[in-house]
Amino acid sequence: MKKICVLFCMIILYTSINPINSLAEVETAGLTKCQESPAFTKRLNNSVKKLETRLAKYDANTPPAIALQTQIIKTKIRFNKYAKSGILCGTDGLPHLITDGRWNHAGEFMIPGVLFLYITGWIGWVGRGYLRDISQTTKPTEKEIILDVPLALKYCLSGFTWPLAAIKELTSGELVADNKDIPISPR
């Protein structure tokens, strides 16, 4: 029964991430591509102009002048990357993230979001394993304060498979505690 429930949840998750009727090139809430946005170009020109105004106050080969020249180059490169990436900009000229599930915008939000969830899951799974292991030692509180580095490294190196291990423990019943093992505080 638990396997069927897990399979059903995975199917629901997959279909919610992959919408069938997504339209690829529909404008979203009045947003335009940054390279076509006059406000984006104006913002670039204003940023470069401010830096060039500051640059005019210094002699040519002084450290502040070199730092400002480098900052001007980096600003132009940053704006150029936004323009080439296809990210959409608003009327203010600022890039906006589209989080509606379309795959052509996956690089903006979904991929970093999934990566964030994977890394936080890794940290939680490794910490859980370490705490469960040290709870069986004679001084668990001491090992929470002063880490047992070899043991912690063992869990860190094996933590990258945490999604598979979590599914295995969920289907075998190890992940979820019984109701009788959970204390209820009297009120």
Curated annotation (Swiss-Prot):
One of its GO terms (biological process) is photosynthesis. The chain crosses the membrane at residues 106-126. It is a single-pass membrane protein. This is Photosystem I reaction center subunit III. Belongs to the PsaF family. GO terms for cellular component: chloroplast thylakoid membrane; photosystem I reaction center. The keyword Repeat does not apply. It is found in: Plastid, Chloroplast thylakoid membrane. InterPro entries: PSI_PsaF, PSI_PsaF_sf. Residues 1-24 form the signal peptide. The lineage of its organism: Eukaryota, Rhodophyta, Florideophyceae, Rhodymeniophycidae, Gracilariales. Probably participates in efficiency of electron transfer from plastocyanin to P700 (or cytochrome c553 in algae and cyanobacteria). This plastocyanin-docking protein contributes to the specific association of plastocyanin to PSI. Keywords: Chloroplast, Membrane, Photosynthesis, Photosystem I, Plastid, Signal, Thylakoid, Transmembrane, Transmembrane helix. Its main location: plastid. It holds the Pfam family PSI_PsaF. It comes from Gracilaria tenuistipitata var. liui (Red alga). The gene is psaF.
